[in-house]
């Protein structure tokens, strides 16, 4: 008699890392907050657009604050409270996002600005003649 073959599946278990990295990307149009573990695996994320803000309201400081609070709320459910912060971009939500992190009682080990700066980069467009 033939026995049915049992399906062997691997269950993925999320490892709770003691520390996380909060990446804040603040552009002039939107603010994206991504929280990863130390290896770079995404744990939670949020953005101004994902929080329900549309159009010009996405680029406000208040939208960045709400996006940061949402991402941290998902992350702290896993009982992780220590983080590093990497900020990039010149947007208006940059300082507000950092203020929201400080208000959430997350222990910060360091804050680093990782905005890319060109070493004389691309040639600018020609001057406009009107």
Curated annotation (Swiss-Prot):
Q: What InterPro entries is this protein classified in?
A: Ribosomal_uS11, Ribosomal_uS11_bac-type, Ribosomal_uS11_sf
Gene3D superfamilies, per the entry = Ribosomal protein S11 (3.30.420.80)
Subunit relationships:
Part of the 30S ribosomal subunit.
Keywords from the named record: Chloroplast, Plastid, Ribonucleoprotein, Ribosomal protein, RNA-binding, rRNA-binding
| Membrane-spanning segments | none
- Positions in coiled-coil regions: none
- Entry similarity comment: Belongs to the universal ribosomal protein uS11 family.
Matching Pfam families: Ribosomal_S11
Cellular location(s): Plastid, Chloroplast
One biological-process term from Gene Ontology?
translation
Gene (UniProt): rps11
List the molecular function annotations (GO) for this entry: rRNA binding; structural constituent of ribosome
**Entry's Gene Ontology cellular component terms:** chloroplast; ribonucleoprotein complex; ribosome
Can you name this protein? Small ribosomal subunit protein uS11c
The lineage's top-level taxon is Eukaryota
């Amino acid at each position: 008699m033939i026995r049915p073959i049992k399906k062997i599946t691997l269950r993925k278990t999320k490892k709770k890392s003691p520390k996380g990295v909060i990446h804040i990307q603040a552009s002039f149009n939107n603010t994206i907050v991504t929280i990863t573990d130390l290896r770079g695996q995404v744990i939670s994320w949020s953005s101004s657009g994902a929080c329900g803000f549309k159009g010009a309201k996405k680029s406000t400081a208040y939208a960045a604050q709400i996006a940061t609070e949402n991402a941290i709320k998902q992350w702290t459910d896993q009982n992780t409270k220590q983080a590093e912060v990497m900020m990039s971009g010149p947007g208006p939500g940059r300082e507000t996002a950092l203020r929201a992190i400080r208000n959430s009682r997350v222990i910060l080990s360091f804050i680093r600005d990782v905005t890319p700066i060109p070493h004389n980069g691309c040639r600018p467009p020609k001057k406009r003649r009107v």
